[in-house]
Amino acid sequence: MPANRSSDDSTLHLPRILCLHGGGTNARIFRAQCRILTRYLSTAFRLCFAEAPFLSQPGPDVTSVYKEFGPFKRWLRSSARDHPEIDPALATEAIDASLRDAMDEDDRRGATGEWAGLLGFSQGAKMCASLLLRQQVRDATRTSPSARDGPNWRFAVLLAGRGPLVSLDPACLTSPAVVDAGGIAMTAFPDERLLAAGTAHVLRLPTVHVHGMLDPGLEEHRKLLAQYCEEGTARVMEWEGNHRVPIKTKDVVALVGHVLEVATETGVLQRRI
């Protein structure tokens, strides 16, 4: 079965969420990791899983369960030693092509719902937030929203996401608070004085942040929320887990509640009376 294929044709008409896997995994693995979440969202959303464009070593703990699920992929460079330099514009083109391929394939399978949201884990969460930021800064320069040449992303769900965000359109966004698409994904956060010097990097579109309280990167995830999201636009879910996608029923139900709330507030879903 192709990585982004849904086995349930009853979701073809539903609004869609594009899902971006973490570094060192792939769309097939992320679909498996999100299997419980997909089930609980299946009455409201269709989830589509995109595959990153660049080859990668497997991520931490990936081979213990998914050793036979390669090849493993990444959206960004994780290290200068393991991943060759790439021109930022070419990197952005490759990322956009991967997203477009997944969306086009889902269209060919008969899906008709609007592309409404983004959902990503770890490096994929960084990319989701960066895609929202690109849309935000591009919309600010347009004379009309109808001039948008892609999906209208209403919200993003960020599981274990960290900054800094990535500028996917340097012509619209140049800020010391963001890095380019050819940079190293694990770059340290900019100095707080640089972050405080402007607001071009600050997301105002709605986000849901999912923080595992046992995740070694928890403080970095909290920094993404505090330094890159406008107050009042984000909601946070904390759960007793490490660096992984929640699968226990109580955690998934809580996460689904946040997704449905933000989808209703943004007009993707109708408010229940």
Swiss-Prot record:
Alphabetically, the GO molecular function entries are: hydrolase activity; pigment binding
One GO biological process term is: secondary metabolite biosynthetic process
Q: Which residues form the active site?
A: S122 (charge relay system), D215 (charge relay system), H243 (charge relay system)
Task: List its uses.
Answer: As colorants, MonAzPs are widely used in various food products for centuries. Moreover, MonAzPs also possess wide-ranging biological activities such as antibacterial activity, preventing hypertension, lowering cholesterol levels, causing hypolipidemic effects, and displaying antiobesity and antitumor activities.
Q: Keywords, A to Z?
A: Hydrolase, Pigment
The protein's induction, as recorded, is: Expression is positively regulated by the azaphilone pigments (MonAzPs) gene cluster-specific transcription regulator pigB.
Pfam families per the UniProt record, alphabetical: FSH1
Q: What is its EC number?
A: 3.1.2.-
Signal peptide (from-to): none
Record carries keyword Hydrolase: yes
Write down the SUPFAM superfamilies for this protein, in alphabetical order.
Answer: alpha/beta-Hydrolases
The biological pathway it contributes to is:
Secondary metabolite biosynthesis
Q: Give the matching InterPro entries.
A: AB_hydrolase_fold, FSH-like_dom, LovG
This protein's GO CC annotations: cytoplasm; nucleus
User: What role is this protein assigned?
Assistant: Esterase; part of the gene cluster that mediates the biosynthesis of azaphilone pigments (MonAzPs), a complex mixture of compounds with a common azaphilone skeleton very widely used as food colorants. Within the pathway, pigG may assist the nrPKS pigA in the biosynthesis of the hexaketide precursor. The first step of the pathway is performed by the nrPKS pigA that forms the hexaketide precursor from successive condensations of five malonyl-CoA units, with a simple acetyl-CoA starter unit.
Q: Which family does it belong to?
A: Belongs to the LovG family.
Q: Mind telling me which PANTHER family this protein's record contains?
A: ESTERASE DBAE-RELATED, ESTERASE OVCA2
Q: What is this protein called?
A: Esterase pigG
